[in-house]
Amino acid sequence: MVDYTIGEGMDVITTLNYYGFGDPLLLLAGICPESGLEILYGLLIFVRMYLSGVFFSWFCFEKKHTKRTAVLLGAVSYVFCEYALFGGIRHPFFLNGMMYLPLYLLGVERILQKKRYGIFSVAVCLSLISNFYFGYMNTIMMALYVVFVLFPQPQKRIREKAAILIRMIGAYLAGVMASGAIMFPVVSAYLSCSRSGEGGYTESLLQYPEWFYDNLKEGYFHTNLYVGQWTTLGFTYLAGVGVLILFLRWSRSRRERLRNWALRIGFVLLTVMLCVPLAGRVMNGFGYASNRWDYAYAMLMSYIMVVTLPMLLHLLSRRLPVWIEKTNRHLAVVAGVFASQRFWCALLSVVLLVNLEANIVDAFGRDGCTKLSEYSQIGTSAGDDQGMTQMQADSDGFYRIETPWHIGNQSLEEQYQGHNWYFSIAPGWYFDYYHQFLLNSMERKYSLRGLDSRTALNEVAATKYYVAGQEENPMVPYGYKYIGTNEAGRYVYENQNFLPLGYTVSGWMKKSDFELLSPIDRQEVLLQAAVLEDDDADRVSLMPSAASNLKIDTAQEACTVVSCSGITWDKNMLHVTQDGGSIELRFRGRANCETYLWFNEFQVKWAAAQYQVGSVTAAGRTNQFVLMDPRKSAWYDEPSQTVNLGYSKEPVTSCVITFPKRGLYSLDEFLVVYESMDNYQTKTDVLRQDTLKNCKVETNRISGDMNLSKTKLLQLSIPYSSGWSATVNGKKAKILCSQDMYMAIELGSGRSHVELRYMTPWLKAGVGSSAAGVVIIWMMFFGVPHVRRSRKKKG
């Protein structure tokens, strides 16, 4: 299903699954009143943490660990590791990986013990539908666990091990099949999303910078430090003691020796993985290096504690009293107290709880990894109300609202169509489209903070209203007229040249030619032609190319540096020597233009803050641009930016650039580009000559009528997706990807009824897979055991 309040029209399943769409626990939201949703949101954090401890304990008991105190302390240590305190409370869905990993390993153990293995399939299914990203990481950890547990067993022959492995793979695939309705579409979307490629970490893949290892040592037992690359450790000292005992104590039993050697090797392996960026990249779906999998490391540490705590209790209750008596006979009474395992269990429990309390205080303290000051009070989660809901209800038809640099995803909460979004699984072509214009508000590959008040970009995106704050001189695009304030008291401007959802163009340009133009020239093309893939353009034979007829009303010039404060610029290196450093530029200016400042070949080499927002002030208006250090995980290779200085009837002749923090930047030059508005209305009038009439926008369906005097391309301000299909007068029509972003359909002369329908890609195949998977799992629980019992009775 497509939802136009998600981004600019993204798929519900593929976009929201990363945030819990599909999580069975979130079904509770369906019966919870709206007023209680925030409370439910908070409660589910602790429910997930509790279930993580329950499943961990279940796994330990399945492993025949009967010392309940050891299991309880291990579970508590696991539940309150730094990963849960930092990642789990900040992003509750991050707890899903932590919650289901013990179930994965429990399922493996049950298969090894020749018990029912339906639980394993159910765990795989629930994990993948809750969040396939963490399901992927759990799968890798499960595979490592199988290697360490199955293959070292000398009593099992190779043939027997192969049979067990085949059963595991079969049970795993059954779980994958059952999750297909959600997993198939999501995996398909992930493979084409902008976040799945390289980015963020730019150093060697074999070792992190020295600062990472310094932080790693300090953050191993402390929660008041963020190590970096999503590495969250903060273990208890008791867990550290468990590791020491594991490596120093020798077991007499062969079975225990094999188990302990497996744990030692596993500990070393996971520690090495923490320290090698390549491992972080593999675990992060071959994106940037990230150690979000370190909840598995926390589980290993907690399990080592469960294994070694009985050894520690034996040493303390047996060896220590003997040593005390030998040292001083007068301490026999004390030795008698120390000989009680209950005493040591109680004492170690207190020590662990005090340690955890200190970790929690450190984590949420002023210098902690997750400061309380970063969270909002309950009841204020929606931020400042923009009054968009009422605006959307008061107007007919499909349109979008521009609210520059506003809160991402608030359009989803307030139910209006906008341009502000932040989604980890966003289609890759969204980024490709905005990247063509070096759009400064595309702060990350998966986050858009509005369209930078750019007239052309808003026009082709069906933007009807511009909502600004109460500043004296807002950066309103050309052609927008003030119509009053909305219910939130914000200024509202209406687009006088509004292009509806469907409009027509009579020319096209090949993408290869489009890419030869400068960023602002490309904006000019959007208003005159459809930009098509070269193969598609060759097939549109009835339409003349508009390349030779385009009118590009732009000009550019170099800037002159007037003054610098806290900044030096020499040999293409811009050095900001103090916080708040600024540089003033002068240029001739041009009337009736949208003026852009172009940071040409501009990159952060080093900055005091990994993420900062700079500002450019011109003609009393201020705009923003993002500065991201290569150390930041969201960094991507963007050598230039363009920043809109706004539309003005009078020439804009100067601007001041401010850098919040110290840093070193490479920069070839500052350029100013002017986009004239002299012929703007003429261009939009041409596009409005033939528009989609009787347009209806419904759930997964768009329809309307056209009456053309000649062949044209119907351009739709809906993002392209393979999930859309189209018919014209009942016959299937090809949907073209236009502008690298939107959809276009070629229409002949005469009357045409156009209808588009949406189906989530891979959803049909996924539903069929889920049906088959559920049947197989049902057979695992009920069918196979019934057959076995019948055979035993006959025997």
Residue ranges and their predicted role:
Residues 1-53, 76-99, 137, 190-195, ...:
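Membrane-interface coil-to-helix junctions
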Residues 1-6, 17-18, 24, 164-252, ...:
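Periplasmic/ER-lumenal interhelical loops and adjacent helix-loop junctions
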Residues 8, 18, 354-374, 391-460, ...:
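Extracytoplasmic/lumenal acceptor-recognition loop(s) of multi-pass membrane glycoenzymes
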Residues 50-63, 67-152, 167-187, 192, ...:
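Membrane-embedded helix bundles of polyisoprenyl
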Residues 63-66, 109-119, 149-163, 251-256, ...:
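Membrane-interface junctions at the ends of membrane-embedded or membrane-associated helices
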Residues 86-95, 199-215, 219-231, 257-334, ...:
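Membrane-helix boundary/interfacial segments in multi-pass membrane proteins
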Residues 155-166, 244-271, 421, 436:
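Membrane-interface helix-loop-helix junctions at transmembrane boundaries of multi-pass membrane enzymes
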Residues 548, 554-795:
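Active-site-proximal, structured, solvent-exposed surfaces of multi-pass membrane proteins
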